[in-house]
Structure formats: C-alpha cells, structure tokens
Amino acid sequence: MPGNTFGQVFRLTTWGESHGPAVGCVVDGCPAGLDISEDYIQHELNRRRVGQSRVTSARQESDQVQILSGVFEGRATGAPISMLVFNTDAKPGHYENIKDLYRPGHADYTWDVKYGFRDWRGGGRSSARETIGRVAGGAVAKRLLAQHGVSIIAWTAQLGDLKAEVIDESEIERNIMRCPDARVAALMVERVEQARRSLDSLGGIVEVRARGVPPGLGEPVFDKLQADIGKAMFSIPAIKGVEFGEGFGVAHMTGSVHNDPFERRADGTIGTSSNHHGGILGGISTGEEIVLRIAAKPPASIARLQRTVDREGNPTEIEIHGRHDPTVLPRLVPIAEAMLALVLADHLLRQRLARMER
C-alpha cells in the first residue's frame, strides 16, 4: 500500500490502524540539533485527542506519545524520529454486527473494491485516528518553523450556517469549539448538542494561517506551494474543499479589485498593501500571511437508520452506534495546523537547494 509518506526533504510516514495495538509516525529529514520537547508534542496531541469535551467522540484515549528514536538530550540527532502512541480504549466489538455492511459516507466500499480485503474495525487505516501521526510529526515541523520565525494558527470559522463574526485569537483555546468568537462559539455548542440528540452530525469550515513565511517558498508548475498545501489538506479525512485568499470569491471580483499593489516598506522589504492572493503568487510564497480555509463534511457515522447494501450487494439497513464525533471541527484545528507545518517545513528545506548564494 503506497501513499503513506508525505514530503520530499522533510518527510513524514504514518502507520497504524484505529483499533490496532498502536499508531505512530516516522519523521525523516529533520536537521540535527533541533530542540524537540516531548512535552510540546504531547501538548499538540492533547489538542487533537478524543474525549476532550462534549462535542467530541466519547472514546477515552490518553494518546501518550513515546519518542523511540532520533532524539537525544532533547535535540534531534538527524536520524529518523520514530514516535508511538498505544491505543488503550479500542472497542472493535462495536463493529462486529456491521462488518459485512457498507457504511454510507465511509470508505468501506472503496477499500473493498481496491484491495478485496479490509480492516472493518472502525475503518482501520482510513480512520481519522491515523492523524495522530500527522499531529506528532507536525509538532516537529512547527519547532523547525519557529526557529525561522514562522507561526501557524487555525480556528473554527463556521459550523453549518453559524459563522464567526469576531476574530479574537485569544479566545480560540478558551472554548471547546476552538472558535475565535465567544458568542458564536456558545451557539455552535448548542447546535452540536442538538445534532447529537437528533442522531445527526454537522460540517463546517476551519481557517488556517501561517505568519512569518519568507518569500520564495514553493516550486513552479507541479510543486506549487498551494498545490502541495492543497494535497496536504485534502489528504485529511472528511475534507471536501480548500480555498486560498479570496478563494471562490474571486469569481465575483474584477482584476482591478483582486490585484494586490506592491509597495516598498519602511524596513526596505517589498510587500503588498492587501492580501487577496492569500500569500502565494505563481505557486511561490510572497512573504505575506498565507491564508486558507478548508471545508469538512459532516461525520458519516450517525445512529440514524440508513439504507445500504452488504458485501454481496443485498439491500439492507444500518444503524451506526458507538463513540463518534458529531462534528470534526474542534479536533480538525490542530490537524490542519500540522499539515500546513509539514508542507512549509519541507519547502523551507527545499529552498536551500534552489539557488547558489554569493
């Protein structure tokens, strides 16, 4: 099964299944000497963890990370960094009675078609539990970026038709929706609880931003920066849309409005007076803030009676019980940050190979 490794110079490989013994990752290409704190990686994993609030899955996992290699005395050695998290609350029995049925909205059917065999325990490798490795690897990428003055932040921008109207970044980690608008966050919680009572789920939008990104990151044509970021975001389970800058709003704009005028700033650098382009032009970073939004579908696991078929194609009905997220948005925030960090760390290291300095 290919497709488990992401990146060219700074590379992440994830492994493990939802209800297997453990999940984890290997980070390769991390420069030696980088400060790596297990506590910081754990902090990032805690933000992604299930069971952290009443708007997430009730599965109880501590997600305690163990660094197995590549770090000595708190610093990267340059060797592959291997990290492991044991699954301690897996309950595959919840899926025993539906193992031969195709869950609507899930990858059961497509995996069967492709491989002829699948792990039916909570989706196996296709489960969002795989993203533990992404967040752990992304934490290492964040440390690398921080040393170069780059920071990444994300938040829940929209749940259903509820949109954040105020952007107070200090509010994001103060509420369980990770929404920067406290008033709207409270409404979102009510909406999620209502959906759970109705045996349903909700989708929404997460906004992601990167600041301090130097100009010049990204490769022309097929490895454009936004192309790699788009691939990273679309690889996250449940993501159905990605837009940069003004996104699909450009369809309603004119060139004279959308174009961002260049200017020379007081410190001598060149920048733009606006940022409709979202920090990337021609597939290469401009030095402005990188701005993108990702749309997540409603989680497919709902306890309502739904029509489906079994592996033989016989019509039947299915109810999916167990411990499932009524919305992915709060836990999507750290995952999206991690994936953007992985792309930027990779392109930062690749940029060192792009030109000879005089």
Curated annotation (Swiss-Prot):
Query: Could you state one GO biological process linked to this protein?
Result: amino acid biosynthetic process
Q: Where does NADP(+) bind?
A: R48, R54
Pfam short name (any one) = Chorismate_synt
Pathway in which this enzyme or protein is active: Metabolic intermediate biosynthesis; chorismate biosynthesis; chorismate from D-erythrose 4-phosphate and phosphoenolpyruvate: step 7/7
The name of this protein is Chorismate synthase
Keyword Lyase in record: yes
Catalysed conversion reaction? 5-O-(1-carboxyvinyl)-3-phosphoshikimate = chorismate + phosphate
Q: Which UniProt keywords apply?
A: Amino-acid biosynthesis, Aromatic amino acid biosynthesis, FAD, Flavoprotein, FMN, Lyase, NADP
What is the required cofactor set for this protein? Answer: FMNH2
Summarize the subunit comment. Homotetramer.
- Which InterPro entries does the annotation name? Chorismate_synth (IPR000453), Chorismate_synth_AroC_sf (IPR035904), Chorismate_synthase_CS (IPR020541)
Family membership, please give it. Belongs to the chorismate synthase family.
Q: Which organism is this protein's natural source?
A: Roseiflexus castenholzii (strain DSM 13941 / HLO8)
Extract the PROSITE patterns matched here: CHORISMATE_SYNTHASE_1 (PS00787), CHORISMATE_SYNTHASE_2 (PS00788)
